[in-house]
From Swiss-Prot:
The keyword Transmembrane does not apply. It is found in: Cytoplasm. One of its GO terms (cellular component) is cytoplasm. Pfam families: GTP_EFTU. Residues 45-79 are annotated as: Disordered. GTP binds at residues 17-24. The gene is fusA. It comes from the Bacteria. Belongs to the GTP-binding elongation factor family. EF-G/EF-2 subfamily. This is Elongation factor G. One of its GO terms (biological process) is ribosome disassembly. Catalyzes the GTP-dependent ribosomal translocation step during translation elongation. During this step, the ribosome changes from the pre-translocational (PRE) to the post-translocational (POST) state as the newly formed A-site-bound peptidyl-tRNA and P-site-bound deacylated tRNA move to the P and E sites, respectively. Catalyzes the coordinated movement of the two tRNA molecules, the mRNA and conformational changes in the ribosome. One of its GO terms (molecular function) is GTP binding.
C-alpha cells in the first residue's frame, strides 16, 4: 500500500520528563497551536484530548506515542 503522505516533511519528536512535569500538557498545547485539535483538554480535569492518556495512566504507564500529520505551519496565540 502506498503512503498517503510525504515523509519529506515528517518529523519525530520525543518528550521525556519526570512524572507530573507537564508532558501531557505540553503535548496538548503543541497539538492545539499547530491546529491538530481545536480545543485544549485539561489534565487536572481528566479531559485531555490526547488519546491514550486515561488508559495509560490507569495502567500505571506514563509512556505514550501518537502519530500526527502536520503541514509545518504553526499558529500564534493572540491572547
Amino acid at each position: 500500500m502506498a503512503r498517503q503522505f510525504s515523509l519529506e516533511n515528517t518529523r519525530n519528536i520525543g518528550i521525556m520528563a519526570h512524572i507530573d512535569a507537564g508532558k501531557t500538557t505540553t503535548t496538548e498545547r503543541i497539538l492545539f497551536y499547530t491546529g491538530r485539535v481545536h480545543k485544549i483538554g485539561e489534565v487536572h480535569e481528566a479531559q485531555p484530548r490526547w488519546t491514550g492518556w486515561s488508559k495509560s495512566k490507569s495502567a500505571g504507564s506514563r509512556s505514550r506515542r501518537r502519530r500526527q500529520r502536520h503541514n509545518g505551519k504553526a499558529t500564534a496565540s493572540t491572547s
